[in-house]
Regions:
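Conserved SAM-binding motif I beta-strand of class I
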Residues: 82-87
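Conserved alpha-helix/loop element of class I SAM-dependent methyltransferases that forms part
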Residues: 38-56
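S-adenosyl-L-methionine
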Residues: 100-126
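Conserved beta-strand signature within the Rossmann-like core of class I S-adenosyl-L-methionine
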Residues: 170-178
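A short SAM/SAH-binding and catalytic strip from SAM-dependent methyltransferases
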Residues: 133-153
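Conserved class I S-adenosyl-L-methionine
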Residues: 59-67
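Conserved SAM-binding loop
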Residues: 96-97
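Glycine-rich SAM-binding Motif I of class I
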Residues: 69-73
Length: 217
């Protein structure tokens, strides 16, 4: 894919949140509305270095709120057996399809990724099966807000219900916390402990942090 074609696709699919290098062309730059130097490749490098084995061979990954799909693609490139990416936003969903197509052409290999354009709260988890890792990067605090409004009583209940249902389908979660009342490290610690998970590793990132939770069993 030529650089001019990449630039054209990036513009057509804007606005972007995940910052991804596409053969020297960045999906988002410092003058763009959602620019965050840590979104995308920077965050993936932390996940890969701090939480994951060198290979994801024979593992299944669930990437919730996958956005443009960079963590899904990167997991597949680490030899994951299968990756399921879930994204509610229609434009981000289209970005994910484009990013997958780009990296398949760039790496010259088929990536076993399935994207689902849906609300996380509506997923048929029993049908999706079990996963070795569930990524919930910067998404838990968004669950329920499209139905009930952000941080309403109903939205917070749905977040807890979703985590409870997910806990039956994995032994490892990787999430991001912030420093608000309903998205802090302590808040999520209590939420996950109620479902049999303990904080295994915490990586501070200023006002945010990355956490690995592992099942007690």
């Amino acid at each position: 894919m030529m650089s001019k074609d990449i630039v054209k696709q990036i513009k057509e699919l804007a606005p972007w949140y995940q910052r991804i290098n596409l053969n020297g062309v960045m999906t988002i730059n410092k003058d763009d509305h959602y620019f965050n130097v840590k979104a995308g490749e920077h965050t993936w490098n932390v996940i890969k270095k701090q939480f994951l084995p060198d290979s994801l061979s024979n593992m299944r990954i669930l990437d919730l709120g996958c956005n443009a799909g960079f963590y899904s693609v990167s997991s597949s490139l680490l030899e994951a057996k299968e990756v399921i990416g879930v994204e509610l936003g229609r434009n981000f969903f289209k970005q994910a399809l484009f990013i997958k197509d780009f990296f398949e052409k760039y790496s010259k290999k088929k990536l076993n990724i399935k994207y689902i354009n849906a609300d996380i709260g509506d997923l048929d988890l029993d049908n999706l099966g079990d996963f070795d890792y569930i990524f919930a990067i910067a998404i838990i605090y968004h669950i329920g807000k499209h139905k009930y409004g952000k941080y309403t009583k109903e939205a917070l209940k749905e977040q807890k219900d979703v985590i409870k249902r997910l806990s039956f389908h994995t032994k490892k979660f990787i999430i991001r916390c912030r420093n608000g009342k309903n998205n802090s490290r302590e808040y999520y610690k209590n939420m996950f402990e109620e479902n049999g998970f303990v904080e295994s590793k915490f990586i501070p990132q200023g006002k945010r942090g990355m956490i690995l939770y592992e099942s007690r069993s």
